[in-house]
Amino acid sequence: MSYLDGLQQCVDSLQISIGTLSSSIDTLESGIHDFPRIKHILKVQRHFNLISEDELSARQAKFEEIVKPILSKAFQRLEDSISSLQRQEDSLKTKYELQEARLDMLKNRPATSAFSVTTESSEQLKAIIAKRQKLVYTLERYTLQLQQKRGH
């Protein structure tokens, strides 16, 4: 009976191995049931090309060669525009002060018999006042534009 006992032990061992394999298959199956999705996720797709550091440095240098002159020209034009507006502002301030001085001089001039206010001189005075107001408005507008450009 020892022969049958040996066979029985082999059968028992085989059944234990089958049980272990079945549980291993169940464990693996639960682990790979999502395998198609994982396969799709792990699929190699290049969203970004990998380049060497030397190539990156070369491309950055080339980019700088292209962009720096453009930016320099733009900044120069901006500085020229600002200086032009500054000159216009200074010119308008000077013109305003001159007109204001002339107007004050006309207002402060004593009324004499030699200087009689005629309709022509009153019209000139009105024209000067209107021109002065226009210059004040223009000066304020240029000042605001200059402040906006400096602010940005």
Curated annotation (Swiss-Prot):
It is found in: Nucleus; Cytoplasm, Cytoskeleton, Spindle; Chromosome, Centromere, Kinetochore; Cytoplasm, Cytoskeleton. GO terms for biological process: attachment of spindle microtubules to kinetochore; cell division; mitotic sister chromatid biorientation; protein transport along microtubule to mitotic spindle pole body; spindle attachment to meiosis I kinetochore. Its main location: nucleus. GO terms for cellular component: cytoplasm; DASH complex; spindle microtubule. It holds the Pfam family DASH_Spc19. Keywords: Cell cycle, Cell division, Centromere, Chromosome, Chromosome partition, Cytoplasm, Cytoskeleton, Kinetochore, Microtubule, Mitosis, Nucleus. InterPro entries: DASH_Spc19. Component of the DASH complex consisting of ask1, dad1, dad2, dad3, dad4, dam1, duo1, dad5, spc19 and spc34, with a stoichiometry of one copy of each subunit per complex. Multiple DASH complexes oligomerize to form a ring that encircles spindle microtubules and organizes the rod-like NDC80 complexes of the outer kinetochore. DASH complex oligomerization strengthens microtubule attachments. On cytoplasmic microtubules, DASH complexes appear to form patches instead of rings. Belongs to the DASH complex SPC19 family. PANTHER family: DASH COMPLEX SUBUNIT SPC19 (PTHR28262:SF1). Component of the DASH complex that connects microtubules with kinetochores and couples microtubule depolymerisation to chromosome movement; it is involved in retrieving kinetochores to the spindle poles before their re-orientation on the spindle in early mitosis and allows microtubule depolymerization to pull chromosomes apart and resist detachment during anaphase. This is DASH complex subunit spc19. It comes from Schizosaccharomyces pombe (strain 972 / ATCC 24843) (Fission yeast). The lineage of its organism: Eukaryota, Fungi, Dikarya, Ascomycota, Taphrinomycotina.
